[in-house]
A protein has these predicted regions:
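Short alpha-helical elements of helix-turn-helix
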Residues: 17-24, 68-75, 100
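Basic/polar phosphate-binding segments, predominantly the helix-turn-helix DNA-binding elements
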Residues: 39-69, 92-117
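Basic, amphipathic alpha-helical hairpins
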Residues: 2-8, 22-37, 57, 61, ...
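An amphipathic alpha-helical interaction segment
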Residues: 1-24, 41-44, 48, 52
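Residue-level marker of regulatory loop/turn positions in helix-turn-helix DNA-binding domains and
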Residues: 12-16, 31, 35, 46, ...
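Short, basic, alpha-helical segments at the C-terminal edge of helix-turn-helix-like DNA-binding modules
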Residues: 69-78, 117-123
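…primarily DNA-binding HTH/wHTH and HhH modules…
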Residues: 3-15, 105-123
Length: 123
């Protein structure tokens, strides 16, 4: 019996859109449960093996699932900062950050400014 090499799978823009949609649903779930977003829990949410999901996500988006999830959290926070008067602790919770300090740290890494300063600049 000869084993054939597996062809590398090609992912499309539609795959990325589905992943992003699943992340948005998961972040909504995190907000409803007041819990932090975690890769292992995201995999459970999708009923997938975490290692498989991580490998697949890297193939789809080119970065680790953790990094992509964090970027989506920051994008959601940006949207809420610029379109709502919500306080930062609510935005942190809604975007799936476990604590406000984690939110501030990640936001500063992404934008080199605090979320409040970002809101002022975007007014």
């Amino acid at each position: 019996m000869t084993l054939r090499a597996r062809k590398p799978r090609t992912f499309t823009h539609a795959h990325r859109q589905r992943l992003d949609h699943a992340i948005a649903l998961y972040l909504d779930e995190c907000y409803a449960n007041k819990s932090a977003a975690r890769v292992s829990e995201f995999a459970a949410f999708l009923k997938l093996n975490p290692e498989y999901l991580t490998r697949t996500a890297v193939s789809i988006v080119g970065v680790s699932l953790r990094e992509h999830l964090r970027r989506k959290q920051i994008e959601e926070a940006e949207r809420l900062i610029t379109t709502t008067p919500l306080p930062m602790y609510e935005i942190a919770l809604h975007a799936g950050f476990g604590t406000t300090s984690t939110f501030y740290r990640c936001f500063r890494q992404a934008h080199s400014m605090a979320p409040g300063a970002f809101r002022e600049v975007r007014k």
